[in-house]
Amino acid sequence: MGLIFDLDLTLVDSSIAEKYRKTGDWRKVYQLIEKFTVYDGIYDLLTFAERLKVPIVIVTSSPSNYCQKVINYFNFKISNLVCYHDTKLHKPHPAPLSLAVNNFFPKAKEVISFGDRVIDIDASKAAGLISVACFWGSKEIEILNGSNPNYSINHPIEAIKIIQHYFG
């Protein structure tokens, strides 16, 4: 059993730094981390998973230095992470998710993957994972819904029912 989360616009609203992330101005992005916000319900969701002893891995297309800064700033309790430089191929390719499963959930029968973009859902499905489209931070809701995820949710608290169904 295991959970995989995308970072930006799934766990945290980092939209204030989006233009700097796209241009690779990481110094400016780091300065803005304190202005990011954790979506309502995320801490409850992560605490619930922790109580069930379900390991959590963040898989992101961002560099590890950035990811670690965000995790530390918001005190996310996660098991591990897979970042941009950990694989040669990136989402929507399943390589980052497959790396997470093989390294951190090698005996897992079921892994649930949460993301806000079509590339998250496509990568999850290609890796054979249970895919959950997260609408609260998504900028592409219509096409995200059209990507045929296993589940679609509007609020992080809705993820608790999915986790209970598989791991509860």
Q: Model-found features: residue ranges?
A:
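Active-site neighborhood of HAD-like aspartate-dependent phosphohydrolases
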Residues: M1-G41
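Conserved Lys-Pro-Asp/Glu-containing loop-to-beta segment of HAD-superfamily phosphomonoesterases
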Residues: G2, P94-I121
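Short, acidic loop-to-helix structural element flanking the phosphoryl-transfer center
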Residues: Y30-V57, Q68, N72, P94
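Surface-exposed amphipathic alpha-helices with a cationic face
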Residues: Y43-R51, V101, I121-K125
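Glycine-rich phosphate-binding loop signature in dinucleotide/nucleotide-binding domains
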Residues: L52-V54, N103-E110, Y166-F167
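Conserved phosphate-coupling serine/threonine residues in phosphotransfer and NTP-handling enzymes
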Residues: T60-S62
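A short, structured active-site edge motif that brings together acidic residues
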Residues: K77-K91
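Acidic, Mg2+-coordinating phosphoryl-transfer loop and its flanking beta/alpha structural elements
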Residues: S113-S152
